[in-house]
């Protein structure tokens, strides 16, 4: 037998089998020659499910969506050259959003590097600081120690991707021709697998009893506190945060991605309209908390970030089990290096419940009054973008997923996604906050979460049209709501809008595209609606039926800005009297 083929088959067979043994059973593959042996072995392994995606950029975002939904590593595989470079945007997002990805790139062997060989470039540390770990893999050899080595490398990669903070790991495989493995070999999946093969078990970072007692004593003296919750991946966090908040008596400013706004948990302490009422300058200057305790990523709301920056006299505690806590406000005074779930459980177990005080009551009161104003959009007849969120939430069934794109949709979710006993899982790409790869990420998530509705603007939709191919190839079910204001709607809210001479060409960027034909090219249905009754009917139809459904609603950018500002101004006026004389 050809020793090279035997080495290639057993070495890569051991690697693929170890991935499956470690429960990395989903692989998104883009076609290419140098990655042939890995692709064939993955396709052949009975425990691994493969997804084909031709465009590497979309493929990587698709895997990102799966990994976000599963909360466990998903692998991506491509050939050498610029194919690997196209993974870069999704790798950056995965790193900053703390999503576990295994990035597997095939490469030319060392003798074909830097000599002008085709489809060869330097892939060493290709993703730089945007991966948790880079592994330059050894060339295949038909020796037992090499089979053990490649299994150990798989284990280390999965552990690195999975441990806090989760993130992407890059493994680069140099491979020589010929590239076709021999599936007739005995024990193809068994090489290097024995009693010594490691399993990595992640523990939970906890607090010392001394620290718990000390912090509880401090909290008992600090009556005016706030709990701020951003995007967080822990499934248990919703219940334990709600219980912790009730014990402390502190209001919870809950970002929509915290998933604290919806569900059957106790929502008494949840504040959901802070992005609107924190625009009031008097409130920012006079409502001074003694302590702010933060969990998860930084919330979407700019008004909240500005408010936090003003709280110079407060204690700012961030709970983060990694050493890379997130605080763009630069106000951290203490970092608790522990699992947020473990932190809340430990504190709640030993705390006495504080009765609701005036501090909580005034936050709750102003939140309720603000919500009354914002709910007026539910009666609007005009095509207002904020109402897209309120109407979809009404339609979605229990347990559904709402994926919101960056730019305006996530901000409208922040403003108009109110507390609701119906559980709706909210997702978005808030690592680097780009508009690229949104369709692909949502489609990846849809392999795990059904039904799923994506709300996306027309520019973001255009940016990832290639991603629609996954819905066709893999028979996926998704309803995509395209909010088409013919351009970049968010820029109308920013100072750039005042540059009238160049605004449309540089920022408004109207495309004037009709997306109907491209959606049908990918096997989907497309409908453009006018009127809210038709909108609700079509979204409901998309949720019930299988396949790709795109519902387009056209809005006016200028009118949308005016309606948003009208609501914010009305809210500010209504709460002004409530704040007069309140200087505490």
Curated annotation (Swiss-Prot):
Molecular function (Gene Ontology), one example: 2-succinyl-5-enolpyruvyl-6-hydroxy-3-cyclohexene-1-carboxylic-acid synthase activity
Top-level enzyme category: transferase
Keyword Manganese applies: yes
Entry keywords, A to Z: Magnesium, Manganese, Menaquinone biosynthesis, Metal-binding, Thiamine pyrophosphate, Transferase
Essential cofactor(s): Mg(2+); Mn(2+); thiamine diphosphate
Domain of life: Bacteria
Pathway participation: Quinol/quinone metabolism; 1,4-dihydroxy-2-naphthoate biosynthesis; 1,4-dihydroxy-2-naphthoate from chorismate: step 2/7; Quinol/quinone metabolism; menaquinone biosynthesis
E.C. designation(s): 2.2.1.9
InterPro entries: DHS-like_NAD/FAD-binding_dom, MenaQ_synth_MenD, MenD_middle, THDP-binding, Thiamin_PyroP_enz_TPP-bd_dom, TPP_enzyme_TPP-bd
Similarity comment text for this entry: Belongs to the TPP enzyme family. MenD subfamily.
NCBIfam families per record: menD
Assembly, per entry: Homodimer.
Protein name as it appears in the record: 2-succinyl-5-enolpyruvyl-6-hydroxy-3-cyclohexene-1-carboxylate synthase
Native species: Bacillus cytotoxicus (strain DSM 22905 / CIP 110041 / 391-98 / NVH 391-98)
